[in-house]
């Protein structure tokens, strides 16, 4: 007895195949969630970056943040009447102390200042060299020993972890502030001659700024404040006046930004405590 051939499969709906129907799980509709709508300006902790040349007053300005606690990596706060931890000498210690602050913020601490992010990056680099190996499992003696760009990618990952630690503090209602040194950086200009611009002294990435810790920090921050000495031009020559300004908006000469202000402040006209109010930086 000859068996008859099985009937052909039923045609799938237009635009779909029978096999796709079997393979594709049924889409689920998420449960409805009620919105929690608020209006007006919300009081929230802030992410702040202050950068400028050594000795210009970065630590002094940060010291007037409410309830400031310095994690002092280069003894920049020793002459200031602030709470500080000046014993951190490694990346592991720095991350561990931030974890302790997240777990149990000390009474009275409302702002955490890392002095400086430039030194913190060096600690991260030392940590990567000491703990990571190449793809062949070999130890290296310098960040370049990992191969082109690979070592700095590890440092970028470590520093991103530090920013995540600081985000946890912000979620608890604490302001966080990174101080940094300055560096002049060549900026390509397709419309004319290239020029130099002041930026925070952090790793800038490759030629296309991929893997840039500097750009990552800028994008992360609510405020990037540039402190600089004023220069006046007389008879075609620049002359320093000894006065200082705080820049909150970006210009060809520097990077800066603020979510709440767009002005230039005379650092010597106001006391440091009043500057935070003039910048409209909301502190919980």
Regions found by a protein language model. Name each.
Residues 68-70, 176, 224-226:
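Short, well-ordered beta-strand core segments
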Residues 185-284:
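Conserved GTP-binding G-domain of TRAFAC-class P-loop NTPases and closely related GTPase folds
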Residues 3-37:
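N-terminal pre-Walker A segment at the start of P-loop NTPase domains
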Residues 60-62, 168, 216-217:
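Hydrophobic/aromatic ligand-binding patch that stacks against planar heteroaromatic rings
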Residues 33, 38-131:
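Conserved P-loop
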Residues 2-3, 284:
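Acidic, gly/ser/pro-rich intrinsically disordered tails
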Residues 100-104, 123, 169, 220, ...:
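Conserved, well-folded catalytic cores of nucleic-acid-processing
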Residues 119-213:
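P-loop NTPase motor core
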């Amino acid at each position: 007895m000859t068996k008859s051939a099985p009937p052909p499969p039923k045609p799938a709906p237009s635009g779909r195949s029978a096999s796709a129907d079997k393979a594709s799980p049924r889409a689920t509709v998420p449960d409805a969630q009620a919105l929690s709508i608020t209006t007006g300006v919300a009081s929230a902790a802030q992410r702040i970056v202050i950068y400028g040349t050594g000795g210009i007053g970065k630590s002094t300005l940060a010291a007037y943040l409410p309830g400031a606690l310095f994690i002092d990596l280069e003894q920049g706060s020793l002459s200031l009447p602030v709470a500080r931890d000046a014993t951190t000498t490694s990346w592991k210690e720095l991350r561990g102390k931030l974890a302790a602050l997240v777990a149990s913020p000390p009474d009275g601490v409302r702002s955490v200042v890392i002095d400086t992010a430039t030194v913190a990056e060096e600690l991260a680099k030392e940590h990567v060299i000491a703990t990571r190996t190449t793809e062949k499992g070999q130890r290296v003696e310098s960040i370049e020993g990992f191969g082109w760009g690979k070592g700095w990618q590890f440092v970028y990952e470590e520093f991103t972890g530090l920013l995540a630690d600081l985000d946890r503090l912000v979620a608890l209602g604490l302001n966080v502030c990174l101080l940094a040194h300055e560096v002049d950086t060549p900026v390509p200009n397709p419309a004319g001659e290239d020029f130099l611009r002041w930026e925070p002294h952090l790793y800038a990435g490759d030629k296309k700024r991929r893997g840039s810790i500097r750009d990552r920090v800028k994008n992360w921050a609510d405020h990037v404040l540039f402190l600089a000495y004023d220069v006046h031009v007389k008879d075609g020559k620049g002359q320093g006046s000894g006065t200082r300004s705080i820049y909150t908006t970006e210009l060809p000469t520097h990077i800066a930004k603020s979510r709440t202000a767009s002005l230039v402040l005379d650092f010597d006209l106001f006391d440091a405590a009043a500057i935070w109010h003039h910048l409209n930086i909301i502190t919980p």
